[in-house]
Amino acid sequence: MVSSWWEIQVVGDAALEEGISWRLQSFGCQGTASQKQNHDCHMTGYLPQKQVNHLDLAALSLWLAQDAIALGFLPPTTRWKLINEEDWATSWQQYWHPQEVGDRLLIYPAWLDLPEHCERLLLRLDPGVAFGTGTHPTTQLCLEALEMHLDQTFGPVEQVTVADIGCGTGILSIAALRLGAKQAFAVDLDPLAVESADRSRDLNEIPPEQMIVQQGSVEQVPHPVQGIVCNILAETIIDLIPTLATISQPHTWAAFSGILVTQAKSVVDALEQQGWQVGSLWQRQDWCCINAHRL
């Protein structure tokens, strides 16, 4: 039997993008895609038909309107329709385009033909709707942090190994390798994320021994590394920090994101209590990335 999915489309002021994305994800949407046109943001999310009904969708529309009015904006337009699973698998792709990040990276949809001439390092991605497309501020902050750390690393960058904790699609591991790192350990508790990271590795033609993908967490990283990236929830990062001692050494650098600005102090305090020195905090919209190194 063919499964059906709700496709939810929200059009509102571009300043509401983060709030709309949060609301859709809280509602249960398995991935969102965003496109800006002039001063508007077009956001699309998907979730199984059986998960919600029309009354739930009407409530979502009301919440989105209330969110906007509270911030002094006009309510966004919210529409929804049912689509078949085959359409759901590809319909979101129309909203996602190549995205330049930092000075050297380019996130590139896998279904597009490769560019003939490109001075940037390509990160090819086909995440499906269950995982991010690399456009979220936290992902971009981590990618930019990787550029900085690998440019400023102690010793040859070709000797750097990186641990990617909570790897999702594996985009951060792939970026680290494209930027010159020797090896990346990509780990995630979610088996679907492990499958996605495996696909990303193959899509980018990276040898399995160079990007090692495993289900699990810090315990799957076999030895201390020179760099750590961790783009997950702040509460999870705080819980993980004590365990990072097993995979770090003096001068190991780390980039932590998935952190709201309002949560930053709690993460910084936890890091400093475990022997990390925070060097900088980068902010984008309501999110931040904490750059630190091990003393």
From Swiss-Prot:
Binding site for S-adenosyl-L-methionine: 139, 166, 188, 231
Pfam family, one: PrmA
A GO term, aspect molecular function: protein-lysine N-methyltransferase activity
GO biological process: methylation
Alphabetized Gene3D superfamilies for the sequence: Vaccinia Virus protein VP39
Keyword line: Cytoplasm, Methyltransferase, S-adenosyl-L-methionine, Transferase
Record-listed E.C. numbers: 2.1.1.-
InterPro entries to which the protein is assigned, alphabetical: Ribosomal_L11_MeTrfase_PrmA, Ribosomal_PrmA_MeTrfase, SAM-dependent_MTases_sf
Entry keyword S-adenosyl-L-methionine: yes
Free-text function comment from the UniProt entry: Methylates ribosomal protein L11.
Alphabetized NCBIfam families for the sequence: prmA
Family: Belongs to the methyltransferase superfamily. PrmA family.
Protein name: Ribosomal protein L11 methyltransferase
Organism: Cyanothece sp. (strain PCC 7425 / ATCC 29141)
